[in-house]
A protein has these predicted regions:
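Conserved GNAT-fold acetyl-CoA-binding loop/helix
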Residues: 47-68
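Conserved beta-strand in the GNAT
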Residues: 82, 90-100, 120, 125
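A short helix-loop-beta-strand connector motif used in the catalytic cores of GNAT acetyltransferases and
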Residues: 67-82, 101-104, 120
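Conserved GNAT acetyl-CoA-binding A-motif
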Residues: 140, 147-159
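A conserved beta-strand-loop-helix scaffold within acyl/acetyltransferase catalytic domains
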Residues: 96-111
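Conserved acetyl-CoA pyrophosphate-binding loop and the N-cap/start of the following alpha-helix
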Residues: 130, 134-142
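A short beta-loop-alpha structural element at the N-terminal edge
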Residues: 27-41, 52
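Conserved beta-strand-loop-alpha-helix junction that forms the acyl-donor binding cleft
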Residues: 131, 155-166, 180-184
Length: 184
């Protein structure tokens, strides 16, 4: 029996089960083109939760995202991951992805030049009943590991108020990035 499996059977002196971590109770798998619909659903739900989309715009966002995701996953412009309960591997409870863009050479530090790609973390979403269990952090750690292995020069993201503390704990910092929102 693995140590992680044994943990679930141990009990504290007060007879409560020992706390299990997200890594013990969830599995992570890569998304495929066949998963474009669930990724699009997560994306639309994420914006809905933030109050940025509702009604007909929800379905339009979902349909447009699905179409683009099918193309981008196939061409490896988008890499996604899902979390599933270890006991129910077909039940997707959370997801996250990286949108890849080539970038011009830039200094990574005073003596190293990066010439690869930038990854923008997007679509971080956990179904409401599964939140506050460490799943989003588990997905972001997977993305960080993958990005290091793939020599992605830089990871960026746009944090929601709810997600900011997760990203800060994992080493993300605020930057000087600004955004032009255009004229109405």
């Amino acid at each position: 029996m693995k140590e992680s499996e044994a943990k679930q059977y141990r009990r504290h002196e007060d007879a409560y089960p020992e706390q299990r971590t997200a890594a013990d109770t969830f599995q992570i798998r890569r998304a495929t083109t066949r998963d474009a619909d669930i990724i699009a659903w997560h994306r639309a739900r994420m914006f809905q939760d933030m109050g940025d989309v509702s009604g007909d715009a929800f379905e339009m966002l979902r349909a447009n995202a699905r179409s683009r995701l099918e193309q981008w996953i196939d061409k490896a412009h988008y890499i996604g991951w899902f979390a599933t309960p270890a006991t129910e591997p077909e039940m997707i409870v959370a997801g996250a992805g990286v949108q890849l863009q080539p970038i011009l050479p830039r200094p990574l530090d005073v003596s190293t030049i990066g010439e690869g790609q930038q990854g923008t973390i997007v679509n971080v979403f956990t179904e409401p009943q599964w939140r506050r269990r460490g799943i989003a952090g588990l997905l972001i750690k997977e993305i960080i590991t993958w990005s290091k292995n793939e020599q992605i020069d830089r990871l960026v993201l746009h944090a929601s108020d709810e997600g900011r503390s997760i990203y800060e704990r994992l080493g993300f910092t605020e930057s000087n990035e600004m955004r032009f929102v255009g004229v109405s």
